[in-house]
Amino acid sequence: YIYIGSVVVLSYVLFLSWNEEKEIKQEFAEASFIEQNKSEELLPPGETVGFVQIQNEKLDVLISPSSGKVWQARLKEHTYLNNDESQGVRVFGFDLLSGFKFYLNSGFVSEGDGFDVVGVTPSSISLISLDGKISKTISLKEGDYELIIQDSWVGEVPADTPTPYVAMYRTDGRALDARDNFFENSSYTGVAFNTPDEPYANTRLRNIDERVEYFQRGGWVAFIQKYFMAAIITPSDRAQTLIALPPSNGSDTYVMGAISRETKVSEIMSGVEHRVFLGPKVRSDLISRAPDLELTIDMGWFWFLAQPLMMLLSMINVLVGNWGVSIILLTFLVKLLLWPISAKGFSSMAKMRTAGPKLKEIQERYKDDRAKLGTEMMALYKKEGINPAGGCFPLLLQMPVFIAFFFCLRESVELRHESFFFWIQDLSAPDPFFVLPVIFAALMYLTQQLNPQPPGMDPTQAQIMKFMPVMIAAIFIIMPAGLVLYSVANSAISLVQQKAMYKKYGASDLPGPGAN
């Protein structure tokens, strides 16, 4: 019943979750980012003609040398498909067929009208604006997921000090290279801000219908998708406005970024630096990059349980080197820690099962006198030391652990494309041959045979309960194999524990509800 409740709740959550830039001509107070009218040749993915390519061990980036825009960023170590031939997942990118685009630009408000290339290295590009006023360098940190942009003013700075900005531009729609399935689309996709008053404030693009802005020092603005994200990380001492803007002037593009304020002339001349993270949402890595950046990993309602569970899972994986085995070992450890609670529930059910024949006799004797039936049943419970709710409440306390495990495994990029054994080659994807859901259904059926039938359950309800293993297995068909593996391990261990407790109370040889 605990699984039924948990799976139904989580299925409901999943159901709910499923259900251009023109150069800036306004003054700072009215600055807005609008789709640029200048035509730029957009090439199909995989083609680099017309773009400059820079790369390091983690990222492969395409930059337009004429505008300085970062048009594409691929993650080399995270492929779209689970094979060696597949290309890396795109964080930034475009799709000519659908019109989808997600890119980044930076510079000075109302300044810059095209660039020329000054120099190129394997991991960087240097540009100068056509009017010679702005110098731009875009580089990749060695062996890292960060893009570093440096915008500098060349020559004398005007009295009206130019305002630096950095922004991401995105049309609404499903993330590039995301698997199109129910479970994949259930994760949060949208904008997130880090502010002094709210460490993690998020909203979906379609909900942005007016200008959103936060005046502050430091912080970050990010666009989050399942497993990966793009985040603009600002210096803690820089005064700025974090913004999100809806489409305007006929554009279909949303904007999220940062506009610097109170920028010193010396800083503009030496170069305003922007950090942009483009990579996987690995908690330990995000913690080291910026305060509260790890909050972009959605650990759900029971995050205080999910976070330590993920830490334990990672520690176990370091020792055994297999995420599937790690899930089984962590499940065993959790069941061991929860044994005192489970034991109370199992002992109560064992006593109920032992008293089953007497209870059935009372029900037959007083079937026409419900008042007397209730009195005699309560007298039997008192005599045998049975608490009718004793078997449910301790197990109910374990539901938060199951839900925490659900979010932990759903959001963990560490499990993406990680194999277990044999047919399971991706723990983040559903079991391709439905073996684990079938095993779970069998274990759930065996567990039902052990559990005493609740008093007063009508025959129709009893028949529905018999088909519950099949219904839960059907739901598990679309769940990640890692989560189903946890459920199988949890059910198997619970079954062993329950049989041991029944043997202790002499209830093993008594007929269960299936025999009745």
Predicted feature locations:
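Short extracytoplasmic/periplasmic juxtamembrane "stem" segments immediately C-terminal to an N-terminal membrane anchor
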Residues: 28-50
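Intrinsically disordered, low-complexity segments enriched in polar/charged residues with Gly/Pro
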Residues: 39-41, 48-49, 125-126, 248-250, ...
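Helix-loop-helix
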Residues: 1-35, 63, 151-152, 166-185, ...
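Soluble non-transmembrane domains of integral membrane proteins
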Residues: 55-295
